[in-house]
Amino acid sequence: MRKTYWLMALFAVLVLGGCQMASRSDPTPTLAEAFWPKEAPVYGLDDPEAIPGRYIVVFKKGKGQSLLQGGITTLQARLAPQGVVVTQAYTGALQGFAAEMAPQALEAFRQSPDVEFIEADKVVRAWATQSPAPWGLDRIDQRDLPLSNSYTYTATGRGVNVYVIDTGIRTTHREFGGRARVGYDALGGNGQDCNGHGTHVAGTIGGVTYGVAKAVNLYAVRVLDCNGSGSTSGVIAGVDWVTRNHRRPAVANMSLGGGVSTALDNAVKNSIAAGVVYAVAAGNDNANACNYSPARVAEALTVGATTSSDARASFSNYGSCVDLFAPGASIPSAWYTSDTATQTLNGTSMATPHVAGVAALYLEQNPSATPASVASAILNGATTGRLSGIGSGSPNRLLYSLLSSGSGSTAPCTSCSYYTGSLSGPGDYNFQPNGTYYYSPAGTHRAWLRGPAGTDFDLYLWRWDGSRWLTVGSSTGPTSEESLSYSGTAGYYLWRIYAYSGSGMYEFWLQRP
C-alpha cells in the first residue's frame, strides 16, 4: 500500500482540484491571484518530434526527494502499479524522471503541487551532414584572411576534462593517444561510437592532428544511437551524469539539438551552475536558433558555422541566441571505422568543438575560472566585423584561439530594456516589467535576471490565454542568475521574479519581439 500512496494522493488532488478553478470571460488580463497558474504546465505536446506517451517530469526545488530516493529501480517499483514505466531518473542537473505513462497518470502529475512542469519527450539529433584540407584550426588563430597554412597555440588543454555528449567516441583511435575514455552510456551500451559523429567531434576538440586542444582528457557521454538520434530524456541523462561526476576544470560539448525543451535547457543551466562550461550547436536549419534547445540557453556558448571565406554557412542557424561563429564547413577529423580513419563533415556540430577546444585552452591557463568568466574571455577575445551573411540578429563574432589570460565581463544583451527591483526574502515576488504585463506580437522573448551573490532568485514567464495566466517558461537554477528565451504567439505576457532563498536588489533585462 505504501508504494502506491504517493500517486493515489495525486489523483485525489486531481479530483478535488477540479472544483476550484476560477472562471473569467473578460479577455483583458488581471493580476488577481485567483487567475495565476494552478497546475504544472505540459510543454511540447504539439511538437512534431514528440514521442507518443513519453514524458519528462521535473520537480520543484526541494520536492520529490522521497520519490527519487533509491534511484530508478525503487522509483519504478513505486510507480509501476499505476502503469508508469520509468526510463530515467535525474538527481544532478534536474530533480525528476522520464517515463512512459497513460493520460490519467500524466494529469495526476500535472495536478501535483510538487511538480514544476512536465514535458513531452522528443527526438534529438546530431547536427551534422556528411561531405567529400584542414582549414578550421588555421582560421581560428588569426584575425584576417588569407590563411597562413599553420596553427599556432600556446596551450594544449592539459589537465582539462572535456565531456562529449554525443554518439560515443572510438576511444582507441590514434588521434587520442590514450586520452579518451568512456564516461557514461544512456543507451545501456559500452560508450563506443557506432555512428562517427562523436568521434569526429572529439577529434576536433582534442585530436593530436585535428584538435584545438591537443592534450585534453576526453570523456564519451553517449546519448545518441548508431543513427545519430536519441531522445530528450536520454540527453538529459547525459547532462545529469556530467553534473554529478565531472572533474574540474570541465567543459561539455553538445553538438546536437532539437525543438524547444525547457527540461533540457534547465538541465544545462544547472550543470553550468555546477561549474561546467558548455559549448552547444546553434543548429543546421538556416533558422532562428532561439527556437531550438539547448541552443537557446544564454549561459552556454551557442555556436554557428562559417565557411573558409568567412561567410555564414548556408545551413547554420542564426539570431540573437547565437554567441559566436566558428569554422563548420568541410571540417576533417577522426572517424569511427578504424583507429586511423578520417572523415570530412559539415555542420554547426563541427563548429562547436572548436569553441569547446578553445575553452579548454583557456582553462589550462586559468583552471579556477568560472563558466561565466570563460564565456566572457572567449566572447571578448573573438574577432569582430569579418563575417558576411550572418543572419538577422546574429553577432559578428568569429572564434579566436589566442586569448589573453585575463577575463572580462559582457552585458547580457544589447538593445534591451533594463529594470530593477527588490525581494525581501523567501516567498517574496515581483512582476516585471514595472509590476504589470505587456502586449507583444509573435516572436522571441528573452530575459536575464541577476540577484545578489548567495541568493536563489527564479524567473517565470506567464501568458494570458483569455481567462487565466499559463506558465509558458521558467528558469529555476540554484544560483542568483537566471535567463529565459521563449518564442510565442501574439498576446499578453508577464514576468514573475520569485525569491526561493535570500533577499536583496536584483537586475532584470528584457528583450521583446
Curated annotation (Swiss-Prot):
GO molecular function (one): serine-type endopeptidase activity
Keyword Signal belongs to the record: yes
GO process annotations (BP): proteolysis
Coiled coil residues, start to end: none
Disulfide bonds: 194-226, 290-321
Record's subcellular location: Secreted
Swiss-Prot/TrEMBL keywords: Autocatalytic cleavage, Disulfide bond, Hydrolase, Protease, Secreted, Serine protease, Signal, Zymogen
Pfam families per UniProt: Inhibitor_I9, Peptidase_S8
InterPro entries from the UniProt entry: PCSK9_ProteinaseK-like (IPR034193), Peptidase_S8/S53_dom (IPR000209), Peptidase_S8/S53_dom_sf (IPR036852), Peptidase_S8_Asp-AS (IPR023827), Peptidase_S8_His-AS (IPR022398), Peptidase_S8_Ser-AS (IPR023828), Peptidase_S8_subtilisin-like (IPR050131), Peptidase_S8_subtilisin-rel (IPR015500)
EC nos: 3.4.21.111
Catalytic activity of the protein: Exhibits low specificity toward esters of amino acids with small hydrophobic or aromatic residues at the P1 position
Family (UniProt): Belongs to the peptidase S8 family.
Annotated function: Aqualysin I is a thermophilic alkaline serine protease.
PANTHER family xref list: CEREVISIN-RELATED, PEPTIDASE S8
Listed name of the protein: Aqualysin-1
Native source species: Thermus aquaticus
Chain's gene name: pstI
